[in-house]
Amino acid sequence: MTDWISDPQVCAAAQLLKQQAVIAYPTESVWGLGCDPGSLTAVEKLLRLKGRSLSKGLILIAANTEQFSPFLGGLEPDALRRFQTPQQKPTTWLVPNNSSAPEWISGGHDTLALRVTDHPLAAALCQLFGGPLVSTSANPQGQPAATSAEQVQGYFAQAVGVKALDFLTPGTVGGAVKPSEIRYLLSGEIVREG
């Protein structure tokens, strides 16, 4: 098993994230595009690259629940336990927005989309970066999500200037066949089957 936390390319990617870069990296089921959620410049670059609207909101991933602490304030103990309980499949929780995240992450919605990633490389990126990352599928709007590094390169190789991808990590996607399940934390209602 690769020790991604000390991999030079993953370390380089984490440093680039701190400089408003947009990177591509593998997740549990598809390749993702990621950036610093606190940087409007980086988020706008990612959205231009993908051709996605700011109003849709974005998923954040983290290496552990502690990295999401600012966004979990105000949750009832039962809801917090549900969020902290490992799931059998990748699950993105829609958590009440306590106004800790910038509006460009929430898209102006009353929830935030948060997932603790099980993918070792993605988790290492979050650890090295020091917090959550934006995570959206690596594909232009309307195209299938990339499942290989080659597909990511095919989608974004022609991009130049402000639409250019800054870095492509090593690695492969995990074993999940479908994208993460999305469900409301408080009601348990499933928005997207995983």
Region annotations inferred by a language model:
Residues 1-194:
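Active-site-adjacent structural elements in enzyme catalytic cores
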